[in-house]
Structures are given as structure tokens and as C-alpha cells.
Amino acid sequence: MKSSTFGMLALAAAAKLVSAHTTVHAVWINDVDQGEGNSQSGYIRSPPSNSPITDVTSKDMTCNVNNKATAKTLEVKAGDKITFEWHHDSRSESDDIIASSHNGPILVYMAPTEKGTAGNGWVKIAEDGYTDGTWAVETLIKNRGKHSVTVPDVAAGEYLFRPEIIALHEGNREGGAQFYMECVQVKVTSSGSKTLPEGVSIPGAYTATDKGILFNIYDSFDSYPIPGPAVWDGASGSSSSSSSSASASAPAPTSAAPAPSSFTTIAKQPATSSSTEAPSTENTPSETTSTTSAIVSTTAVASTTAPATPSTTSAIASSAAPTNSVPQPSSNAGGAVKEWYQCGGLNYSGSTQCEEGLTCKKWNPYYHQCVSA
């Protein structure tokens, strides 16, 4: 018993030191790469590091620790596909996206920019949890860090889109779940017919003891309760506060250009979108898939080797391409693994050889780590 308790405490302590975290680096619109967006000159409100938020009552749950307007805003229309691209260190092919041990759900919220910045008006528009034995994070890694949503048929204006990962590798204890999120600045240019629901407050939508947050992924289970409100069904009205099921499939809002929202791999394509000049203030903010009447579909598809053909050309409210000035931790993608980095475990595909003087310690079937010998 003592040995088991010590092992769990050691795992919890060591995991805090592991730079196996993740952030959103870029966004694609209708399969067109919008370029690196995680800097003050970009379109993502990015934190200075890829560390998680663990206190569900913190104001940092809204848009992470850097909830300030950035220089650019992406322009979209109802029915457009927005793809979020997550990475551990960089957009390089060798990047491991997020540690394979960090299993859990992926959710996407949206809110009007002014209300969302203040932590209010957040409406869940997509989610993926645990389906047929596969976690959403596992699908994300297979899809090279990409998952997508469809822009609802809402009124024109500026919005924040908030993709979120909840890593549950320490979810067996209260306060152990890790939350990764950023806010992407988006301007909807089409005039939609649907009224966005009132939404929920973030922080406020979760508690540390919610069934989908205080959750032991190492126990035997057949289903997983995704925390937070239900996915919006696309109709005008109020947002429900009830918990969602493991996966969602809801009617899509009517739009002139309906498109499915799916967690899918996107063929790489250079950023060739048009751009316009638009000042920013602190207070203002393909790969072809079959058409379906669903806000979210979590079926993974095989990656394509041919460049995708975008259905529309999106615009960024700036003429300059964003450059990344956000500090990032060093990568351990190739060669010997550095201290505190992952070196093995179920579904892990990276190097298993630790640097000299280190040994690959097995904490549990899902997570092995390089520590001092």
C-alpha cells in the first residue's frame, strides 16, 4: 500500500515537470492555412508557455493567462470550416502534438468577443470525448493536431472561438485535470438568422468534482461524461447547462454554405488567403468531406496527400503574415530523450532512449518518463 501510494505521489509530482503540454499554433479556414497565429501580431490570444490551467475557478480558464486582444482577426462566413492546429513545441513534422498519456476530451466554445473576453456568453458548438475505445486526444494526435468545427449561422460580428483540451492523466484526484485552451479572434461577415444562446460563464461552467473532470482513466469504464453544457443545436434559444454525452451529433444551423464539422486531418497548403487592413483595439475584438446536417462529427478520416481545394477564400484583418514570438520549450522529437520527457507507454511512438545518466521510468502503462538513474 505504501509503495502504491508513493508511486502515485511520485507520478503526480513528476508529471508537473514534464514539458508535454500543448497550445494552438495556427488555424485553417476551408482547408487554407492562415499561418502561425500564436503571437501578439497574430490572431490567437496565446499564453507565454504551453502550461495548463488546473484551477477551474480561475479567470485564466476564459482564454488562458493572456486574455488580451491581438493584432489580427480572421474573417469567416456561416458554413465555413475552421480547423484548429495544436502543437507541443512547433509546427514541424516531428512535433508530438501532446503527450500520448494526456488522454481526454476536446471541446469548442464560441462567444461574442466583448462578452467572451469578460468570461460570459460561452456556447459549446462541438465536443468529442471517448468513443469506441478511443479518446479525442488520441484522434487529435493521429490527425497531426487538427480538429474542425463549422461556423454556425449567427449574426455578423466579432467572436472568440475557444478550443479546449481536458487532459485526464491525473484526473483521478481533485484538481489534477489539466485544461489547455486559447481564444481565436474571428469576424463573421455573413448575416445569420440564428440568435446565439445566452451561453455559460467560464469560469463557472465546470467544478473540480464534475464527473468528467474528476475521472480516473486508469479504471475500467465503458463511457465518459463530457463536462459542461450540451452542444448547441443551432436553433435560436437558451444554452442548456446539463452535461453532454460522450459524443454529439446535433442539427446544423441553416446557412447558404452548409459544411460538416469534423475532427479530421487536413492536407498542408500554403497561406494564400487575401487580406485587408483593419485596426485592432483592446475592447474589440479541402480535404472534401460529405455534406451532413450535423454541427459536430467526430469520425476521423485518413489524411490526404494532395492539396485541398478551398471552397472559399478567407481573409485576415491585416496585411502582414503573423510571426511567432511566443517562447516555446525545447523539443525532444529526435535522438535521446531529455530529463522529464516521455519515453514510452501505450500509443507512444517517440524515442525510448534517454540521455546519458537517465533511465526510462514506467509510472503506469500509459506513461514512461526519463528520470535520473
From Swiss-Prot:
Binding site for Cu(2+): H21, H102, Y180
InterPro entries: AA9, AA9_LPMO, CBD_sf, Cellulose-bd_dom_fun
Keywords assigned: Carbohydrate metabolism, Cellulose degradation, Copper, Disulfide bond, Glycoprotein, Metal-binding, Monooxygenase, Oxidoreductase, Polysaccharide degradation, Secreted, Signal
Keyword Glycoprotein among record annotations: yes
SMART domains registered for this protein in UniProt: fCBD
S-S pairs: C63-C183
Gene induction: Expression is up-regulated on steam-exploded bagasse as carbon source compared to glucose.
GO cellular component, one term: extracellular region
Ranges of biased composition (kind: Low complexity): 235-262, 270-323
MF GO annotations: cellulase activity; cellulose binding; metal ion binding; monooxygenase activity
Domain CBM1: 335-371
Region (Disordered): 36-55, 234-333
Bound cofactor: record note: Binds 1 copper ion per subunit.
Reactions the enzyme catalyzes: [(1->4)-beta-D-glucosyl]n+m + reduced acceptor + O2 = 4-dehydro-beta-D-glucosyl-[(1->4)-beta-D-glucosyl]n-1 + [(1->4)-beta-D-glucosyl]m + acceptor + H2O
Predominant localisation class: secreted
UniProt subcellular location: Secreted
Biotech and industrial use: Lignocellulose is the most abundant polymeric composite on Earth and is a recalcitrant but promising renewable substrate for industrial biotechnology applications. Together with cellobiose dehydrogenases (CDHs) an enzymatic system capable of oxidative cellulose cleavage is formed, which increases the efficiency of cellulases and put LPMOs at focus of biofuel research.
Recorded family membership: Belongs to the polysaccharide monooxygenase AA9 family.
Domain comment as written in the entry: Has a modular structure: an endo-beta-1,4-glucanase catalytic module at the N-terminus, a linker rich in serines and threonines, and a C-terminal carbohydrate-binding module (CBM). The CBM domain is essential for binding to and subsequent oxidative degradation of polysaccharide substrate.
Record's function text: Lytic polysaccharide monooxygenase (LPMO) that depolymerizes crystalline and amorphous polysaccharides via the oxidation of scissile alpha- or beta-(1-4)-glycosidic bonds, yielding exclusively C4 oxidation products. Catalysis by LPMOs requires the reduction of the active-site copper from Cu(II) to Cu(I) by a reducing agent and H(2)O(2) or O(2) as a cosubstrate. In addition to cellulose, also cleaves the beta-(1!4)-glucan backbone of tamarind xyloglucan, but only next to unsubstituted glucosyl units.
Protein name stated in the entry: AA9 family lytic polysaccharide monooxygenase A
Organism per entry: Aspergillus tamarii
